[in-house]
């Protein structure tokens, strides 16, 4: 990966990683008889043989720590190619270090907010998980600007865990984009396989979330302002009510789920009835939980979408009626245990 995409010179992965390469032989690629790869060492007994036409390998159960990957090929005459490797110090624009992270716990926090260079939002989420789950009882994944090249790696990263907390940017610029839409197939597969997903997308324009079908959207604040003190009501339990603690200065959405697509769906948070100073009608949903029927006897995992920002990269936004940790406490203690 490019350093510009990952925000540093180190590529962090979990124990699954896919490598892809091109093959070329001037006498024709059909003359390539063997491809070999190795991890960490190029000793004569370290190489693992692949078919001569192999152009990729997905490695799993890689030991945590600093790692290197090597690949070479051999042709029918017994001539070997040069060894190519990752990381490659001659490729100054690419990652210079590859670190494999251990899988900790059954909860994954996904940081899809590359413009938060100080990681204030990640620190806030980590702090909540420290309180709810304990230190070192969860993992986190900083995506940067680009998902892994192979969707296999995206799915593997998710499938190491039972619960995924995926937060996105408070707002984006032309140079930065959320990646969750490109992870759509992996997210759907994760949910349908029994995983639970909480996702907090803010900057979106349509209802085409295959992992959470919506009937319609409404912009709650066409002027781009949602003011401090606004109460976010929970029809589940008023003790879960939240309140805006700092001005939300981006346009945000309310929504109505497409209930026909779910086996069951429930509102967790909604906006209050307008007091005349707001433009919305009724009580638009801003956080909902749904579940799908996978088969006559099996339900999917649960998917929760929250369309108000919990953090803007500087400070939390919904702390005006106690900490927003109570939302995650409710999810982990009630919804994600069923």
Question: What are these language model-derived features?
Answer:
Residues 110-112, 200, 306:
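Short hydrophobic segments within beta-strands
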Residues 105-115:
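Short beta-strand segments enriched in small/hydrophobic residues
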Residues 10, 42, 89, 131, ...:
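Coil residues (strongly favoring Ser/Thr
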Residues 117-216:
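Helical hinge/lid and interdomain linker segments adjacent to catalytic or ligand-binding clefts
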Residues 63, 100-104, 156-160, 190-193, ...:
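Extracellular/periplasmic catalytic domains that process cell-envelope and extracellular macromolecules
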Residues 170-273, 323, 327:
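A glycine-rich, often tryptophan-bearing local segment used as a flexible ligand/cofactor-contacting loop or short
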Residues 102-104, 218, 276-338:
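Extracellular ligand-binding/catalytic regions of CAZymes and related secreted enzymes
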Residues 1-102:
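Low-complexity, disordered linker/stalk regions enriched in Pro/Thr/Ser/Gly
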């Amino acid at each position: 990966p490019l350093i510009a995409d990952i925000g540093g010179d180190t590529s962090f992965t979990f124990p699954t990683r896919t490598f892809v390469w091109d093959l070329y032989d001037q006498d024709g690629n059909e003359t390539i008889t063997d491809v070999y790869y190795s991890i960490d060492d190029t000793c004569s007994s370290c190489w693992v043989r692949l078919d001569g036409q192999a152009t990729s390998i997905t490695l799993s159960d890689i030991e945590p720590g600093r790692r290197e990957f090597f690949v070479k090929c051999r042709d029918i005459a017994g001539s070997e190619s040069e060894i190519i490797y990752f990381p490659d110090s001659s490729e100054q624009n690419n990652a210079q270090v590859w670190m494999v992270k251990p899988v900790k716990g059954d909860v994954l926090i996904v940081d899809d907010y590359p413009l938060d260079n100080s990681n204030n939002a990640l620190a806030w989420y980590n702090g909540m998980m420290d309180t709810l789950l304990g230190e070192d009882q969860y993992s986190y994944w900083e995506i940067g600007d680009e998902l892994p090249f192979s969707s296999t790696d995206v799915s593997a990263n998710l499938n190491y865990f039972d619960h995924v907390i995926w937060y996105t940017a408070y707002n984006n610029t032309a140079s930065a984009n959320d990646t969750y839409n490109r992870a759509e197939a992996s997210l759907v597969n994760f949910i349908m396989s029994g995983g639970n997903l909480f996702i907090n997308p803010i900057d979106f324009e349509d209802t085409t979330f295959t992992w959470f079908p919506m009937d319609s959207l409404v912009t709650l604040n066409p002027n781009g302002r949602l003011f401090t003190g606004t109460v976010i009501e929970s029809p589940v339990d008023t003790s879960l009510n939240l309140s805006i603690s700092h001005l939300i200065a981006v346009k945000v959405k309310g929504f109505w789920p497409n209930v026909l697509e779910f086996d069951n769906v429930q509102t967790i948070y909604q906006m209050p009835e307008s007091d005349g100073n707001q433009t919305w009608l009724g009580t638009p949903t801003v956080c909902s939980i749904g579940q799908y029927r996978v088969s006559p006897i099996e339900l999917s995992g649960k998917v929760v979408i929250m369309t108000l920002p919990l953090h803007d990269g500087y400070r939390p936004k919904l702390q005006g009626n106690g900490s927003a940790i109570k939302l995650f406490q409710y999810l982990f203690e009630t919804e994600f245990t069923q």
